[in-house]
Every structure is written in C-alpha cells, then in structure tokens.
C-alpha cells in the first residue's frame, strides 16, 4: 500500500500536493504528527484503503522527538513508503503569505519564522526520498510533478451534458458552453417536434460553414480543457452545452462531441432537457 508523507516549509505547496494525491485516489490526512503514522497505517489497512497520504509540519511542535522512531517503525512495515519534502526561497514564501494574508504557524515575524522552520524541519528533509523546490512552480505545475513522481495512473471520464438555458444551467458542470448562435430548428415547423439526435436536425444545425467553424473551435477547446483536467489528476470532467430549450442545438452538439472525443472516454451523454429524456 503506497503511504506518502508530505512535508516541507509553510507556503511551499503542501496543500496543493495533498489535493493532487487526493484527486488521484489517495485517502489523505492533513497535519498528522509522526507518532500517529503507525496508527494511521493500521487503520488504513483495516479499512481496506489502497493509497494513503499524510502531511506533517512545524505546527506539530514536538514532532522531532518522535520522527526517527516513527519513520523507522513504519518503513519496516511498509516497503512502499515515500517522503516528499517541499521548499521554496524565503522571498517567494513571503510573497505567498502576503498574498493570502495568512499567519505563519510559528507566529513570529515571517522572515524569522522561515529561518526557524527550515532549522526545525531539517531532519525531515534529510530523510526525504524527494525534495521539490517550488519557487518557480505554479500550483498546476506542482500537481503534475507530484503525479508524475508517483507514476499515478487513473481512469478519466468525460461527461457531456446538454441543457436549455431557460431551465437554468447545471450546477455541477466544470465548463458551460453556449451554442445559441447556431441555426435554430425550432423555427422549422417540421423539425420543431424532433430532437438533435436525429440526422435531419443535426444537418440543419450545422448547415453552413460558419456553423462548422464554430463547432470545430468548440470541439478543440473542449478537448484542450478536458486533457488539461486529466493531466492534472482529475478523474472526471463535466462539459455542459446549452441552447435555449435543450431540445435541438445543444443535443446535436453534445452528440457530435461524444463521437469526436471518444478517445477521452466519454462516460455518458446526458440530454437533460430533451423531451424524451433520452440518454446515449
């Protein structure tokens, strides 16, 4: 069972690293003192957890006294034990703290806190398998580094959802797209009672080059957005496509996207507001 200990300087990105591991399927616990690592390991085994990550830092004031013993005991029980230590230069840490207006856990002046924290955490840095300097890394870059570090693989599913704006956009979508600029079959008496799943309706929606160009740009944007989500460790990504009523244009676009983006593992195409309530 992979057991990852994440530590490092306050403001260096521990929360970002822990969230990346959580998105990749790890059970995470924040600010767990070393003397509880063994108990956490036992509980995880008992509950059948397959991946566990914990973080620890200088807020656990007496953690150094238990560090060596806790680490040695755990390493004897679990071969797949990893320790990740994050750091950054003091100037960057200061900027991050000033931006978030947070207080340092040691509670002194920031530059003094950084120096003291480096000293306190030096033993943990010494036993780390990997040290990452996050000075020049964005949160996304760090998350990608963490996932690559542990060679994490995960199933990714793209969910496509068509809807009508007059029924309100879905609240759980990661990306909401408006396709109301496409030709509207509602104004054709023959096509009005039909749906975007039917070939004649789709042909009407994409009847001119402007519509084809619009779709091509939208498709490429959805692909880029979904791939970015996948590469940063997300397990799923929901794209909602909206027209006025959710009967014609959004359905046609969602269905076409499902066919064109098959390689992204389209999990389900849900036509929320289509009269028949059809699901593909």
Curated annotation (Swiss-Prot):
GTP binds at residues 57-60. InterPro entries: P-loop_NTPase (IPR027417), RapZ-like (IPR005337), RapZ-like_N (IPR053930), RapZ_C (IPR053931). ATP binds at residues 8-15. Keywords: ATP-binding, GTP-binding, Nucleotide-binding. Pfam families: PapZ_C, RapZ-like_N. One of its GO terms (molecular function) is ATP binding. It comes from the Bacteria. SUPFAM superfamilies: P-loop containing nucleoside triphosphate hydrolases. Displays ATPase and GTPase activities. HAMAP family: RapZ_like. Belongs to the RapZ-like family. This is Nucleotide-binding protein Deide_09390. It comes from Deinococcus deserti (strain DSM 17065 / CIP 109153 / LMG 22923 / VCD115). The lineage of its organism: Bacteria, Thermotogati, Deinococcota, Deinococci, Deinococcales.
